[in-house]
UniProtKB/Swiss-Prot annotation:
It comes from Micrurus mipartitus (Red-tailed coral snake). This is Mipartoxin-3. Snake venom neurotoxin that blocks neuromuscular transmission, presenting a postsynaptic action through the nicotinic acetylcholine receptor (nAChR). Has no cytotoxic activity. Disulfide bonds join 24-41, 34-59, 63-71, 72-77. It is found in: Secreted. GO terms for molecular function: acetylcholine receptor inhibitor activity; ion channel regulator activity; toxin activity. Expressed by the venom gland. Its main location: secreted. It comes from the Eukaryota. Belongs to the three-finger toxin family. Short-chain subfamily. One of its GO terms (cellular component) is extracellular region. InterPro entries: Snake_3FTx, Snake_toxin-like_sf, Toxin_cobra-type. Keywords: Acetylcholine receptor inhibiting toxin, Disulfide bond, Ion channel impairing toxin, Neurotoxin, Postsynaptic neurotoxin, Secreted, Signal, Toxin.
């Protein structure tokens, strides 16, 4: 009985991911787990030459300012 209870506790901890790791999309739109301390996902559109733009996405420590910056704090919110 104790073994079953211990097994259930371990499974619960693994499933809940008590580390509270944030997940964001990177520039290739793949899911990545953010390192500890990075509490935000971001998506920045940077102007480039000839009317093109560069998309930068991923985890960040803080949110940038500007009309082309998007920052959020929930899993996979920077799509």
């Amino acid at each position: 009985m104790k073994t079953l209870l211990l097994t259930l506790v371990v499974v619960t901890i693994v499933c809940l991911d008590l580390g509270n790791s944030l997940k964001c999309y990177d520039k290739l739109k793949k899911e990545v787990t953010c390192p500890e301390g990075m509490k935000f996902c971001h998506k920045d559109v940077l102007p480039a030459t000839h009317g093109n733009s560069v998309l930068v996405m991923g985890c960040t420590y803080s949110c940038g300012l500007g009309p082309r910056n998007m920052c959020c704090s929930t899993d996979l919110c920077n799509k």
